[in-house]
């Protein structure tokens, strides 16, 4: 199979992609978070193709993407007042809501769980395709399972060429980190996966917002996509350092002693100024120190860049674990295998 990249799609191209999705083919779709690997969310055989292409365990739930909140009605058995408030305030956007599924939704989409994960993406091109397809689209990140998520069409092609039919190219993703996944119980919201919507943002709509205890467990069946098994990992071993630019630079110098070959460094501009003279360091600057949004935008992109350049070690500067930083540090923790140093 030759994978075709569709850039600047015509109306005929959108119709073709919608038809391919309805017919059970795999199409990579752009969103504001990362590129998704799309399949018909009502067709178990189509979703099996996702698991096969990604090498993803089938008990890992999928997110169904829909063009608007009205599309949720046939997919769930109930929508609470709290869930409706979240949709009204954060859709379209990087928020995934899990709700009791209807019989229309196959178990294959939920990993056998009684709740289905649903999201309306904040991406015009994606929503046009979803509307045209007329079906919910199951779409985990369009990468081989365990590797960094793709934020460009080329990233998708590098992992999925020959495994999927089409890639809809809409340029780089704006956010660069996956959606927040929540579960709603009466008037309480539980965060199953941190992401593009922060806890503080949710608290402007719902009074009680908590993190799920399973966020720190690897022993239970995942209730949300991306919360079990190895995720986001680069090819080289990775260590994250959180601290001032000076302490981060000093720690990088200590960790790099005796290392042969290029060392990938994901750093702020301030830290870069302190380590730029070391020729072993291949630096990717994400922005100013502590800028979680900038780090999130560049995180996966930098890991894939380091993979392409075959670095022997990756040293990354982390951020404070608050606000959007919670989502970033969650991804960094997983990518580094929990190798995080606080200075």
Q: Would you name each region that the model predicts?
A:
Residues 1-343:
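Active-site-adjacent structural elements in enzyme catalytic cores
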């Amino acid at each position: 199979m030759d994978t075709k990249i569709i850039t600047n799609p015509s109306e005929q191209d959108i119709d073709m992609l919608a038809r391919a999705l309805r017919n059970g083919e795999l199409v990579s779709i752009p969103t504001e978070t990362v590129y998704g690997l799309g399949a018909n969310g009502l067709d178990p055989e189509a979703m099996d193709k996702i698991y096969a292409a990604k090498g993803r365990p089938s008990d890992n739930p999928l997110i169904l993407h829909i063009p608007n909140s009205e599309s949720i009605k046939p997919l769930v058995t109930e929508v609470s007042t709290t869930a409706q408030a979240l949709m009204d305030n954060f859709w379209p956007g990087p928020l995934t809501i899990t709700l009791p599924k209807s019989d229309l939704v196959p178990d294959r989409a939920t990993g056998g769980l009684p709740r289905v994960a649903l999201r309306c993406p904040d991406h015009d091109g994606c929503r046009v395709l979803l509307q045209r397809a007329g079906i919910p689209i199951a779409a985990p990140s369009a990468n081989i399972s365990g590797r960094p998520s793709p934020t460009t069409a080329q990233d998708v092609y590098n992992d999925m060429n020959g495994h999927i039919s089409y890639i809809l190219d809409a340029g780089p993703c704006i956010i660069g980190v996956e959606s927040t996944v929540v579960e709603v119980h009466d008037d309480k919201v539980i965060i199953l996966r941190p992401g593009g919507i922060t806890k503080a943002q949710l608290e402007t709509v719902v009074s009680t917002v908590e993190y799920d205890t399973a966020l720190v467990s690897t022993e239970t069946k995942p209730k949300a996509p991306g919360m079990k098994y190895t995720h986001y990992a680069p090819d080289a071993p990775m260590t994250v350092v959180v601290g001032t630019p000076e302490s981060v630079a000093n720690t990088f110098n200590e960790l790099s002693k005796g290392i042969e070959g290029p060392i990938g460094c994901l750093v702020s501009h301030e830290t870069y100024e302190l380590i730029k003279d070391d020729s072993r360091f291949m630096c990717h600057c994400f922005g100013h120190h502590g800028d979680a949004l900038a780090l999130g935008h560049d995180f996966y992109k930098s890991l894939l860049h380091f993979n392409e350049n075959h670095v022997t070690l990756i040293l990354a500067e982390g951020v404070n674990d608050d606000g959007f930083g919670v989502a970033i540090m969650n991804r960094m923790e997983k990518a580094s295998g929990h190798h995080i140093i606080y200075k």
